[in-house]
Design a protein with these regions (language model features):
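Short phosphate-binding loop-to-helix
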Residues: 24-72, 83-86, 90
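N-terminal glycine-rich phosphate-binding loop and ensuing alpha1 helix
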Residues: 1-20
Length: 197
């Protein structure tokens, strides 16, 4: 949370910064690590379920803050601690330069994908060589940052709407912490001095 609040406040381009949470403890942490520019919005318990989508929460924030349709809504999930203020600025610049309805962060990955049948038979999604360096990289949506026009978000109820533009990020910026292995990777990044806020 502290990294996300610091990046948002450090960007200098966001008119309002809000943390939406159903936890009073998370709200206290957000307030404690803020310079005073971040407001905490405590969510209704109905928006605190495992099935609650990011878009449901964002629509609640749009309504509570009465944001106009032309507002650029920047979504910064706290599970991406290595996203700095400069990355937020790059995403906003791309959004404005292109006249986008949305911008998302993407990572270039070489993947060997397929599906497994009930009898354990593997079927590749497409033919591929054994060596990873010969695989054509794909661009994968990374939840590090989304920028969405408020009106388009209200209309489509999605953070990614057309026309959408992609901001390519590196593996450290895109490190998303969801499980114990991700924590180990984050600790290694910090220990090696690979993240400069």
């Amino acid at each position: 949370m502290a990294y996300t609040v610091a990046a948002a406040e450090g960007c200098g381009r966001l008119d309002r910064i809000a943390v939406s949470t159903d936890s009073e403890e998370v709200g206290r942490v957000a307030t404690a690590c803020s310079s005073g520019a971040t407001e905490v919005l405590l969510r209704d318990p109905g928006l605190a379920r495992d099935t609650t989508s990011t878009e449901d929460v964002l629509l609640d924030v749009l309504d509570r803050l009465a944001l106009p349709d032309d507002t650029a809504v920047v979504t910064l999930l706290p599970t991406s601690p290595f996203r700095g203020a400069a990355l937020i600025t790059r995403a906003l610049d791309l959004y404005l330069e292109k006249g986008a309805k949305s911008v998302l962060s993407v990572e270039r990955k070489r993947l060997k994908t397929g599906v497994l049948s009930p009898d354990q038979r593997y079927r590749p999604s497409h033919p591929y060589p054994a060596e990873m360096h010969r695989i054509e990289p794909l661009l994968l949506d990374n939840p590090c940052i989304y920028v969405t026009q408020a009106g388009a978000l209200r209309r489509d109820k999605l953070v990614v709407v057309d026309p959408c533009y992609a901001l390519e990020i590196n593996g450290i910026e895109g490190l998303d912490i969801n499980d114990p292995l991700d924590w180990l990777m984050a600790e290694a990044v910090l220990a090696a001095g690979l993240f400069k806020s």
